[in-house]
């Protein structure tokens, strides 16, 4: 005899069993999770100071970062949102010829509450050396001391400042790649939306690495990554609440603060979007790419099986990390050559 059940009765036990299940972590990545500080998995508001201290350390030696390559760094103080000062580090080859180079504008991660430009300087040294680019890293001001719209407006001000000095620094602003990791990925998307809507300097390509896009924290992946991995759903709530306060999750959130809120993603440059299958930002990354495609735009999307948040930088020797980096580098090379 065949037992017939309603759809609701059939689905509810399954949903109850799988509500908090998460995709497995890659076998090369998983052991690292046992060694990370607890606040890298679950960040509570009272741990922000410790998290910030751990993510704002600069390199012990710039010479070690440059490692003998012909790359020079200069710091510049500029005016950010509301008249406050921010610092932009510009990197370029010391043996740069007279030809206009491609440009890279990279925004650091840290969940809107931590990190600094120094976290992306090492990768920019490599990209400047490898691609002959002129690059900039911006130190936007952090929440909760500087809530929305300060971070994204600081990033937009930095973009205007950098592109406005393209001739001085020797790069072609029409060949500019904007990008960022985690919060920096979300801020890159928000900054590009501001450029589109204000008629400002439009990047030629957009690199969103495991981007923080959606303040609502309601996707399946946001529910799955709870007390596990790196940057779980509680961390995400902490970061977004620091940025938005009581507005988090309400209708009173702009598309520039939380780009997943944007219903129209037309007019954006070609995008590269990547995330791990076992991280909070997986589903919002997929949705953002899908919305770009729906608007007739170009997006290359990669969801890496078994990857937790930021696995590419935390365990760079893992096979999946190396595949992810090689795939990303191939895209960057194509974008900067065009």
Report residues per predicted region.
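Alpha/beta-hydrolase active-site loop
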Residues: 146-166, 328
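Gly/Ser-rich "nucleophile elbow"/oxyanion-hole loop immediately N-terminal to the catalytic nucleophile
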Residues: 163-178, 198
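Short beta-strand element of the alpha/beta-hydrolase
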Residues: 100-110
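Hydrolase active-site cap/lid region
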Residues: 193-251
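Catalytic active-site module of serine/aspartate enzymes centered on a nucleophile-bearing elbow/loop
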Residues: 316-338
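Short beta-strand/loop motif that positions the catalytic acidic residue
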Residues: 273-275
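A glycine/proline-hinged amphipathic helix-loop "lid/cap" segment
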Residues: 1-93, 336-338
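Short amphipathic alpha-helix adjacent to the substrate-entry channel of hydrolases
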Residues: 118-137
């Amino acid at each position: 005899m065949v037992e017939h059940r309603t759809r609701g009765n059939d689905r509810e036990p399954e949903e109850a069993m799988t509500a908090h299940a998460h995709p497995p972590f890659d076998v090369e990545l998983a052991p690292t999770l046992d060694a990370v500080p607890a606040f890298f998995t679950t960040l509570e508001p009272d741990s922000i100071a410790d998290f910030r201290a751990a993510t704002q350390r600069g390199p012990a030696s710039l010479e070690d970062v440059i490692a003998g390559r012909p790359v020079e760094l200069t710091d510049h103080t500029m005016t950010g949102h509301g008249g406050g000062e921010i610092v932009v580090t510009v990197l370029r080859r010391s043996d740069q010829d007279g030809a206009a180079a491609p440009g890279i504008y990279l925004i650091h991660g840290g969940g809107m509450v931590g990190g600094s430009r120094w976290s992306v300087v090492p990768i920019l040294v490599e990209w400047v050396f490898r691609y002959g680019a002129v690059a900039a890293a911006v130190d936007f001001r952090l929440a909760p001391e500087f809530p929305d719209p300060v971070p994204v407006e600081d990033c937009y001000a930095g973009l205007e400042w950098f592109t406005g000095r393209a001739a001085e620094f020797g790069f072609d602003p029409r060949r500019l790649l904007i990008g960022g990791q985690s919060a920096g990925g979300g801020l890159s998307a928000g900054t590009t939306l501001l450029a589109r809507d204000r008629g400002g300097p439009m990047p030629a390509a957009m690199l969103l690495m495991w981007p923080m896009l959606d303040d609502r924290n309601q996707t399946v992946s946001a529910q799955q990554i709870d007390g596990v991995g790196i940057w779980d759903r509680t961390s995400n709530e902490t970061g977004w609440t620091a940025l938005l306060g009581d507005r988090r999750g309400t209708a009173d959130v702009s598309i520039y603060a939380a780009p997943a809120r944007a219903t129209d993603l037309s007019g954006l440059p070609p995008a590269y979007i990547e995330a791990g299958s076992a991280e909070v930002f997986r589903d919002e990354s997929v949705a953002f790419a899908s919305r770009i495609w729906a608007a007739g735009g170009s997006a290359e999307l990669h969801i890496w099986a078994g990857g937790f948040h930021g696995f590419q930088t935390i365990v760079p020797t893992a096979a999946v990390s190396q595949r992810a980096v090689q795939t990303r580098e191939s895209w960057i090379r194509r974008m900067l050559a065009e």
